[in-house]
Amino acid sequence: MIENAHLYCGDAMDFYDQWATPMTIVSDGAYGIDGFDGDLKNHEHLADWYEPHVVKWSELCGTFTTLWFFNTEIGWANVHPVLREHGWKYVRCCVWDKGMGHVAGRTNTRTLNQFPCVSEVCVQYIRGSIGNIPIQNYLRNEWMRTGLPLNKANEACGVKNAATRKYLTTDSCFYVPPEEQLAKLRDYANEHGNPEGRPYFGDEVVEQSRSGIDEMKRRMALRLPKFHCPADMTNVWSLPHLSGDECVRDENGKVLHPNQKPLEMMDMLIKSSTDEGDVVWEPFGGLFSASFSAVRNGRIAYGAEIDSRYYDAGMRRFDEKMREAVQIALF
């Protein structure tokens, strides 16, 4: 076993319950283009294919887990309603521009009826909910349950209007209150709110805890999405398609996996949405690029690959890459 890498051969559905709570999930599964064994013939049934996985992600993720969802444009369009239904909040559609090298020598522009495709999308979502309730709705609903006027929330927080304008608003000005302010809302609501509705802003874990503020801080940490944006990055990633030594090939020299992602891209995703020690899931591992990136950057990886050929190749690659990393560190 490789330290901090928990990689399984089989269907991720059989392993999710054994995995630690993820800070980030990197999904690179079926595309509906018949691109590999197990892929669907077209995009029409992708929503059904992904839904069982989305259900488990939603059940087991943290309150503000980040999801990176790779697919084609039409594939993502088919799966987006399922993600939204299960509480995932859309953040940004990123485009991987693979460059002309991706189609050079493989397209005949005289016979094409559309532009050659050199891109795929990677869509960023955050969980943004408590259970299946978006946190924005949860906070406002809890306050409304108290029967107190909204302006009393400002009094509770000791602010002029930040509570009503930001913490309890229904519009785009919303942001999650700092833990100290959330604790003030909770205490005020439970002291002055309708006694029949108590407790407010709490769950069984919080209510049973004798250190309510510490528990609130712990829960707040799970509610805040992590994102560290490099100064030179946008939502268009111009990275050439894989070739050379990084591209894994079979014994005949042919590309082994048609959907292998560049490690440079995986590093960017992992570093931008996690910190050292965080957990990363890769449910459709392929050659485990996201998992390797996670481990070499000090994260903990959980992944699965259903095709034993890809799994074995991915494990060999993982082991080789880790040995290389150790040698580099020694010298």
Regions found by a protein language model. Give the residues of each.
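Conserved SAM-binding loop
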Residues: 314-315
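Core catalytic lobe of class I
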Residues: 1-304, 309-311
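Positively charged, low-complexity nucleic-acid-binding target-recognition regions
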Residues: 1-2, 157, 319-331
